[in-house]
């Protein structure tokens, strides 16, 4: 038995079998969105899904220095002006607090469990009660810049509705938003782009990891653009000049 086995691809003389399709045919007849969808999920998207995933893949193209991925990548490029290490370092800055929709995805999984045979509103009320009572932050909600509404989430939700792809996960996360406002009175913690991507990914039948993969694909062009700019026009060896020391005063003797 071979050391590796895979259902993703097979390289043969003169071609590549990607999920049962000829890569040469994909190159000629498919878009990048369709090819990425096929590679990650094992199937080709239909026309409506392709259009929605086009929106997904442009939703995180750039968000400036608000994104820790950009700041990290530019610092790395400043100290080590090489493209690939800086891009890789930027991706490593993604996680539970930025970019990754994985935690929002699992919130929706948990809400489904709490809802059982109940309504979206009942599921939302139960999960909000749990998180608020335990003083836990709801993943997929809130943004440091977009206080009342994350326009990227709004655009994707509108597009999903227009295309007939606003499924149960979108409806559920919107119900969670309403329940949170009703419970706390806070209107400045909207559904953010991570929450929107998680809901859309679930409605498209993606796994949590597949949803994260599409988020990373979305952020890469902007991240790479910042790395290129930093290498070509930025300051060498950026550093933070100001920092408050909060330790003991310099008074000890050895």
Regions found by a protein language model. Name each.
Residues 1-254:
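Non-transmembrane, aqueous-exposed alpha-helical and coiled segments at domain scale
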């Amino acid at each position: 038995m071979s050391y590796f086995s895979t259902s993703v691809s097979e390289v043969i003389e003169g071609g590549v079998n990607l999920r049962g399709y000829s890569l040469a045919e994909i190159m000629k007849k498919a878009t990048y969105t369709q090819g990425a969808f096929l590679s990650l999920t094992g199937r080709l998207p239909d026309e409506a899904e392709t259009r929605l995933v086009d929106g997904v893949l442009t939703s995180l193209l750039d968000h400036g220095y608000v994104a820790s991925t950009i700041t990290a990548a530019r610092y790395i490029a400043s100290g080590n002006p090489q493209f690939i290490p800086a891009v890789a370092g930027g991706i490593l800055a993604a996680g539970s607090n930025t970019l990754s929709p994985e935690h929002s995805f699992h919130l929706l999984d948990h809400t489904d469990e709490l809802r059982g045979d109940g309504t979206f509103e009942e599921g939302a009320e139960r999960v909000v009660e749990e998180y608020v009572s335990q003083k836990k932050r709801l993943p997929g909600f809130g943004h440091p810049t977009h206080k009342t509404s994350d326009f990227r989430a709004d655009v994707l939700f509108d597009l999903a509705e227009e295309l007939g792809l606003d499924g149960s996960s979108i409806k559920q996360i919107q119900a969670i938003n309403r329940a949170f406002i009703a419970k706390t009175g806070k209107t400045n913690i909207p559904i953010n782009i991570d929450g929107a991507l998680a809901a859309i990914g679930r409605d498209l039948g993606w796994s949590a990891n597949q949803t994260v993969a599409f988020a990373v694909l979305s952020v890469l062009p902007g991240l790479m653009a910042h790395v290129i700019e930093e290498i070509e026009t930025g300051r060498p060896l950026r550093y933070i000049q100001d920092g408050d020391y909060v330790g003991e005063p310099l008074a000890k003797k050895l």
